[in-house]
Regions:
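Short loop/turn motifs enriched for small/polar and acidic residues
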Residues: 104, 134, 347-349
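Anion-binding alpha/beta catalytic cores of soluble intermediary-metabolism enzymes, centered on
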Residues: 169-217, 221-404, 409-477
Length: 477
């Protein structure tokens, strides 16, 4: 699940906000409001109030609490009572005098709460009104009961309802936790960290080790590595270091370890991508029948599901034959990530096929190859522009009738440049989180950008772990 945007107002609200004056209200009059509690309501209330009691915001803690799950802040219900009094009954011009509340049972995520405010007493000498306030859940059980006293408005007020700004809750940690959770229950693997002569690489290595995801093997100049570890006060523990003099030798040794099944994954350190991949694709490297390609698993907060972008790091100008392998690798990876029949959008600048744009010809050919069973396991459509690949609104406006258009799981970029720019735009301008891995070799390979955070590197290691476990199962079968 991705980060969400809170609606500005329920659909049933009118465009005007209007009060009921003291003389218009009679004893026994009521107003009713209904709300369903969402996880983001709890998050937003916690952010606004500063009340980060773990009973409300920490699912792990909540499971061991009295109610065994996250519950709403008590004052969320109180705020809904205030909403009725301040916006509907009496409405604008109302001034709170006092409020009592008694909490009978918890409100949980998914509960639908009905707030009923009833006029109980009126005092003509000061225009005060006492209201009975009751909140019941979807089972008709009272969760909150109280009494409010207000100074009611004496003048009629009717104004256009103000349009409130959208609020997006961006919880990067939660999105990373969801991704890391995919490794739960998987067996840790040995991974060669190739020339990890920088802080981020070493932090990632120690983090995946401490998390039980991987058993890192550090390959590089031992004296330099130990110096960095000591300088940054990292705990080496029993982590093995293989001493080699330079980055070329580190890449070669890592490939040798993988070829001999001594490690199940490679993780790029501070050497260049070209340097590492050159060792991988050597005649006695790690290539198998298909072509190597990179997949980026990216979670954009404004999008309803994660996307897989390929290829942004390995194939510079892929041919049609190359794209067949790239698409198949991405489909197989999507299966591992829980997408049973991934929808693949072959991206181009336009939706029509024209010989003047090679990307459109490749898209048409790939679709036909999928029809003929030359690419299996997914549904492919293209050419599609990026907007029509990810937005149903755009796809419908363009008149595109396709199960892929607007609902793509996989985005195949025309070339490395476009894929790289697309991915980095989402990462840097849309607050996306991501992890990537190279597929198609004997073992998965994690490539790193200089600007990658430690969390991003760990995310990539999680993906490599998922793939490595699949490769291991396949070999045993």
């Amino acid at each position: 699940m991705n980060d969400s945007t809170a609606p500005t107002a329920p659909a049933e609200l009118s465009e005007f906000i209007e009060n009921r004056t003291y003389v218009e209200i009679q004893v026994g009059d009521q107003s009713v409001l209904t709300r369903t509690l969402r996880p983001e309501d709890i998050q937003l209330f916690a952010i606004m109030s500063g009340d980060v009691n773990p009973a409300h915001v920490d699912p792990e803690y909540a499971r061991s609490s009295l109610f065994h799950e996250v519950i709403a802040h008590g004052m969320w219900g109180g705020a809904l009572i205030s909403t009725v009094l301040g916006t509907e009954f009496p409405g604008p011009g109302t001034i709170y005098i006092s409020q009592t509340l008694k909490f009978s049972r918890p409100v949980k995520v998914g509960d639908t709460i009905t707030i009923t405010v009833t006029c109980m007493q009126k005092f003509d000498h000061n225009k005060h009104i006492v209201f009975d306030c009751v909140c019941t859940n979807q089972d008709g059980l009272k969760v909150i009961r109280g009494e409010a006293e207000v100074l009611a408005p004496t003048e009629k007020i009717k104004r256009a309802r103000m349009a409130m700004p959208e609020i997006t809750i961006s919880d990067r940690d939660a999105r990373y936790r969801r991704l890391f959770g995919r490794a739960q229950g998987l067996k840790a693997v040995k991974a060669a960290f190739v020339h990890p002569c920088d802080l981020s690489s070493l932090q990632a290595a120690t983090s995946v080790r401490d998390s039980g995801l991987m058993e890192p093997v550090l390959i590089g100049p031992e004296a330099r590595l130990r110096g960095l570890i000591e300088q940054h006060r990292l705990k080496l523990g029993t982590t093995r270091i293989i001493n080699v003099s330079h980055s070329h030798a580190a890449a070669a040794r890592a490939v040798e370890l993988a070829r001999n099944d001594d490690v199940a994954a490679l993780v790029q350190g501070s050497l260049t991508t070209e340097e590492l991949l050159r060792a991988v694709i050597m005649p006695h490297g790690l290539r198998v029948a298909g072509r190597l390609s990179h997949v980026l698993y990216i979670d954009v907060p404004s999008h309803p599901r994660p996307l897989i972008i390929t290829d942004m790091m390995v194939n510079i100008e892929p041919t049609l034959a190359h794209k067949v392998d790239i698409v198949q690798n991405a489909i197989d990876f999507a299966h591992l990530m829980g997408v049973p029949e991934p929808k693949v959008a072959v991206l181009a600048g336009i939706e029509t096929v024209t010989p003047r744009m090679r990307a459109t010809l490749d898209a048409a050919a790939l679709c036909k190859m999928a029809d003929r069973g030359q690419i299996v396991g997914g549904v492919i459509d293209g050419p599609l522009g990026f907007d029509n690949a990810v937005s149903l609104i755009s796809a419908r406006a363009a008149g595109l009738k396709s199960v892929v258009a607007g609902q793509a799981d996989v985005l195949l970029a025309p070339d490395l440049e476009s894929g790289n720019m697309l991915a980095k735009q989402l990462e840097h301008l849309s607050d996306a989180i991501s992890g990537g891995v190279v597929l198609g070799g004997q073992v998965p390979i994690v490539l790193a950008n200089r600007g990658d955070s430690v969390d991003s590197r760990i995310a990539s290691c999680v993906l490599a772990l998922i793939v490595a476990n699949q490769y291991r199962s396949r070999r045993r079968a």
